[in-house]
């Protein structure tokens, strides 16, 4: 029996294609050497925070596209995003615009999940708007890549430094002793673990660790408490330390905000999550943690980074968000009137459910059903939980 040729004999790059059979060769030729590459946004956010997640995905896209070009095939990316900003969500045209040059190649796949499907494509008007934004964004990216190529350079070394600072600060938070206890009390993650929503269970094996928790309920639970740390934590302290220790690097980032879509998109998205936080509601959920020392420790860390983030983004963008984004604030102001009432009902129901003994099965199940209905209502009001 004749053996199939080795990867080198078949013309495939060594190592990157460890074993290639004849059928695979024929299939690759039929696809004109186009390679689909999937990128994950959710677990990278949970593991390293939003800044490190976005920056490392950006680098991966750029480097993988270069590898494809070097070896004579075309890459296109499948973005495994979610509805929340923390998991890669956002305006489609801005999302595409923020990608590195020569990485879209007129082709892009993207996931749409949960309630985001109805929000984005639930009626002809919104569906038309979002599909037009996506296709026009791809067209614009392709045109700009061909016109400018690699002519424009950005301070990527500074961005890598900022990303590392944000990553370290984020990891310090989630590795701080007592964090799991605070998280378990200050969010309704225990309710989400009992729910039947989603295609997979909230935890991979059932152990009570952060590593075992899936990224979707991680983001969902924080956002329901309006403690939106998954969308900004780490950036505030990272920017402040960069400004104090390397002011010239801080200024170099500021100078390219309007010309570097990736950086501007990151800052605007982060700012949106800051706007969607609510200090009063945040404190009410934090009060569910009955250990005052533990509660105060984590709320002080969270508030400190929140304040740094607001101040640093204001410096970078020259004006406070309230003067630049009046529409967003007006929108949240209208929704908050109803949301504050829903959050209070949710808090009362959550306390009642937690205090009900497990032996009272019917009573506990009835309260759980009520809780899930309230969560659905809050989710619809926040519009940042998918």
Give, region by region, the residue ranges found by the protein language model.
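Conserved radical SAM core fold
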Residues: 1-8, 41-47
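Short acidic, glycine/serine/threonine-rich loops at helix termini
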Residues: 7-14, 47-52, 86-93, 120-122
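Acidic, glycine-enriched catalytic cores built around paired aspartates
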Residues: 26, 40-43, 51-60, 73, ...
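Flexible glycine/proline-rich, aromatic-decorated loop/lid segments
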Residues: 32-33, 93-111
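A structural motif corresponding to the C-terminal end of an alpha-helix
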Residues: 63-75
């Amino acid at each position: 029996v004749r053996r199939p040729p080795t990867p080198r004999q078949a013309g495939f790059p060594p190592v990157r294609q460890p074993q290639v059979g004849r059928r695979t060769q024929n299939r690759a030729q039929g696809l004109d050497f186009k390679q689909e590459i999937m990128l994950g946004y959710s677990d990278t956010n949970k593991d390293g925070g939003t800044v490190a997640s976005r920056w490392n995905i950006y680098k991966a896209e750029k480097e993988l596209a270069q590898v494809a070009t070097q070896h004579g095939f075309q890459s296109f990316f499948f973005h495994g995003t979610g509805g929340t900003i923390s998991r890669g969500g956002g305006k489609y045209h801005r999302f595409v615009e923020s990608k590195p040059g020569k990485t879209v190649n007129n082709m892009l796949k993207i996931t749409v999940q949960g309630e985001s499907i109805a929000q984005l494509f639930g009626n002809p008007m919104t569906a038309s708007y979002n599909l037009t934004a996506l296709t026009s964004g791809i067209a614009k990216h392709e045109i700009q890549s061909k016109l400018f190529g690699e002519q424009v350079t950005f301070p990527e070394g500074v961005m890598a430094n900022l990303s590392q600072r944000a990553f370290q600060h984020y990891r310090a938070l989630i590795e701080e002793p007592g964090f799991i206890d605070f998280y378990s009390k200050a969010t309704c993650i225990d309710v989400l673990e009992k729910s039947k929503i989603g295609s997979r269970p909230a935890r991979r094996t059932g152990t009570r660790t952060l590593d075992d928790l899936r990224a979707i309920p991680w983001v969902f639970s924080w956002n329901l408490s309006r403690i939106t740390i998954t969308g900004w934590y780490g950036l505030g302290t990272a920017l402040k330390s960069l400004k104090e220790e390397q002011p010239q690097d801080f200024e170099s980032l500021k100078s390219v905000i309007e010309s570097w879509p990736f950086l501007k998109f990151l800052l605007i998205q982060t700012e949106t999550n800051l706007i969607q936080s609510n200090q009063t509601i945040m404190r009410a959920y934090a009060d569910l943690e009955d250990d005052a020392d533990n509660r105060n420790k984590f709320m002080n860390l969270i508030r400190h980074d929140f304040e740094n983030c607001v101040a640093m983004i204001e410096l970078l963008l020259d004006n406070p968000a309230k003067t630049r984004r009046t529409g967003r604030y007006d929108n949240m102001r209208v929704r908050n009137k109803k949301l504050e009432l829903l959050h209070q009902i949710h808090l009362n129901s959550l306390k009642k459910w937690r205090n009900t003994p497990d032996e009272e099965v019917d009573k506990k199940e009835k309260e759980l059903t009520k809780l899930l209905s309230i969560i659905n209502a809050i989710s619809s009001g926040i519009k940042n939980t998918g």
